[in-house]
Amino acid sequence: MKKLIFMLLLSSGLIGCSAIDYSELSSPVSPSDTQIERIISLGLSHSDSLLEANKLMDPDLVAIVVKELENRKVKADEAQIEEGIVAEYAEKIIILENNSKFIGPEINVRRKVGLMLESDYEDYYLKGQKDLGNGSISHQLYLSLKYNADKLRNYNSANFCDKWQDCSSGKKIVVANIQSGAGSCSGSNCEYREIFELEFTDEVLKSYMNDGLSFVITSKRNSNKITIPANYIKGYLRVSN
């Protein structure tokens, strides 16, 4: 009998616990958040929103609300600029073969190397091929490296950098050297060019849309860090996907 009573009391206690309204335990909305959302809901211009914030009676509350409104304005402006750059890249995508082939605009980078003020020239663009049968897309990065040296560098491997730009232990990238050779020479140095294609899956490329994609391509004695901006990737994928 005692055991039965104990079980009844225990079950009623559990039922009581399950009936607790946990929404009441959530963090209360601060006065500043309330005022910020109220002002934003008015649909005012930024300057008028600041005027509305300055009507508040508490000077400390005014300072907090104004600061947050300014921060949101900066973020909105940055997002607008970013969208403009993305749209510009997207407009430059070349579409071929019944919407199955995509070629992005070429990016040209001049990079100073060494103490002799020599320069490496890095030219690259993304291109993609869509399988019209199953809709899958494969992507390649066309990369041209031009430099002056006493011999060909023979780049042969590449690996990703992480979001902290550490490239020492990143995953390997499939690299195909499709062309290399020397141009004009002066003394012991010649102008060399090596051209590569690097393979990226659609999933991998999409994972770098927010932070951009950086990788290091290396030879026995040299390494070059290549960075594809996030807005370039977004513009390219906006069209290719």
Regions found by a protein language model. Name each.
Residues 1-21:
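Classical Sec-dependent N-terminal signal peptides that target proteins to the secretory pathway
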Residues 18-203, 207-210, 217-241:
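A generic "folded-domain core" signal
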